[in-house]
Amino acid sequence: MPSRRRVICGAGSLAAAGLAGCTAGDPADRAAPGDDPDTEWPQPGGTERYDCYRNEAVAPRESPSERWTAETSMPMARPIVADGRVLLFTYDKLEAYDLDSGEATWRVGGDDDEWDVRTSPIVVDGTAYVGVALPDGVLAVDLADGERIWHAELPDSPTTAPVVDHRRERLVVGTRAGLAGVTVDGDPNWNRETFSPVSALSSWGDEVYAGTEGGELYAFYDPDDLEGMWRRQLDGSVVQVALLNGGDVVVSTFGGVVDRRDDSATGAARWSHDALGSRGFVAAGNTYAVGRGLTSIHTRTGERHWTLDLDLKAPPAGAGDTIYTGGDGFVAAYAMGGGIGLGDYRGWVERWRYEVDGGVFEGVSVADGAVFATASNGDGATLYALE
């Protein structure tokens, strides 16, 4: 029986085929600034598909100012923004800040807490779900005040943020042993083994995709019982898996390979590019991969438009017609269209660059009309809200 996502995407693919003659140009030509100032970033990939792109989001396109900054330490992932809170996974803690003021509101984990936080969270309907150890499992936390709601014990330590199914009833989390299913009420219900620890996870509809440290890419359907569809061996540890509207997936692996995989033909490669996406990517009309530089690839055809050497180090986020990322001492915004030029020779790509106190390594997020990022140095780290 075809999955819900396959039925939806099949209709979308037929529509796309009918428009093929109209879509051969650069998709960036059709990108426009977002018009919604109230968007959120409720999970590490921004959306269930982990495409790291909010086309409707308002975000600064000109030199920003600081809404606020907050001192923190050892950030491990990009900020999560939802329901008036900014959440940050820092070493063994989950820290919460007020979205408007940056005031610290609550914390889970740390030396004086029983929980050892191991993953970034996902926020679903006012609750943050996060992977913890000692004991291993998923912890549900009230987003408003940090109250612990429940803990669901798992057979092994979590390695990825949870994802949620389309009914918002069931969570899937990656672990060192594979995948585990937990209801949003805290009832564990299944476990699936993989050959190595899960390093990347995404979902849409009733399908779940998992990448592992050993380079395996798995496709599953039905989060109620998680049935396998196919498995592919890739060339390196999987960094990111993003699901496309047309039914395929884009994957990046350690070492920088970015490729598109056919979801209807057991994961066969449609296109592949080497040494481009070791930091991750934004999957929009184009795929914008961040390695040391920024590369634009036509997501449908695989054509590489341009690559710019920008010394970037942060997993990117996209909003409207702009890509946001960072590096040593800066957060920056770049035009999706690549500015003016031909091939790799381009100008006016950078919309703005904001100096920060440290290196931006863990990724940026776009929400509530602002860009959120952390900068780390030898003395600690700072969480920035730029608008």
Residue ranges with predicted function:
Residues 1-20:
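N-terminal secretory signal peptides and thylakoid transit peptides that target proteins
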Residues 3, 29-118, 122-387:
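Extracytoplasmic/lumenal domain signature
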Residues 20-31:
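Sec-dependent signal peptide cleavage junction
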